[in-house]
Every structure is written in structure tokens, then in C-alpha cells.
């Protein structure tokens, strides 16, 4: 899979915020297997870019393409299939089912497009230190725990790219390192690309390319 951005200009962003960007108003190609870091100061359109990449929002000029096909010409059914099999994501606001248990949040995702066995949920939860939370409602967990839940959930499906929006904002250094290692391990197994957007450089991410939004 290849993601291409051709002269993307958000409808809502001031001109001065797009003039010096490595992304806005540029041609950017992100190939499967590449690890791309996007450093985006507050107000530069980081989360909007993430939503553009995932096809949630289309309030921009220019073209965003999956495998040379404009996302604006992709049908809802095609987009749903792409999200199920090729694109995984950790949203900044996580979007967990707060009244479901942690395990249910993970297992629902796994069963929609099975890639791992259920046993891997326990293994990943152990690696990220949330095994004792699996039977607890997700909404009662701390935000840092919820971030780890969202990361593990995103790793349950097949993907060619995983998109991450400030995935470690509420994690300490030790937990950030563990989470990044797990993400990279799973991406490498699939030969998948990683797109990580954050407010500043992430020292735990071995990016092949850094873009400044």
C-alpha cells in the first residue's frame, strides 16, 4: 500500500501555517514499511491530518490517494474494507467503549478482522502492564492505561499502516518505550509502515523520515 498527499491544503488553516510545512502544499509519498514521524506544534493541524489520512474528514483541497486512487472517490464500503484490513489507528481521544471491559474492547476488535489468536491479547497486556485490568470497565482505567488499551486494540487487526496520534502523551518513559517496542515489533512482522504524529520529536521511535507540519 502507498499513501500519497498531493498539494493538500486544509480549508480552515491560516496561510502562514501552511507555507513552511513539509506536508501541506507539498507532494508526500509514504510507502508501506516506512516509518514516518510527523512533528506538529499545537494548532498546525496534526489531528486534522490524521483524520484526513484515515478518511474521516475531507475538508481540504488537493488529493490524498491510497494506491493512486483518490480517497474522495473511494466508496464507503471500500473505505470500510481498507480500515479493516490495511489501516489501523490510535486516535488521540482513543475512542474506547467505556462501559465495556478492557478485554471486550480488545476482543471485539480482534474478531472483526482476526489476525491474532485471543491468547495474544493476554501476552500483549502483560507486556504493557494491564493484565490486571482486563476484566475492569475501560472507562474506569487511568488515561495512561486507556492509551495502552488503545494501542493493543490497534494491533489486533491486519494492517499495512498503523497511524498514531500522540499515542504516549500520558505514559512515562518506561511505558512509552515498551509500547513503542510492541508497535514496531508488530509492524515489522507485517512489513507495515508506521505514521506517528506528535507535538515534538519522539526519542523512542526509530523513524526513517521526519516531517515538520
Regions found by a protein language model. Give the residues of each.
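Conserved ABC ATPase signature
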Residues: 137-145
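Helix-to-loop junction immediately C-terminal to a conserved catalytic motif
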Residues: 54
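Conserved ABC ATPase "signature" region
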Residues: 70, 118-133
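ABC ATPase NBD coupling module
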Residues: 71-88
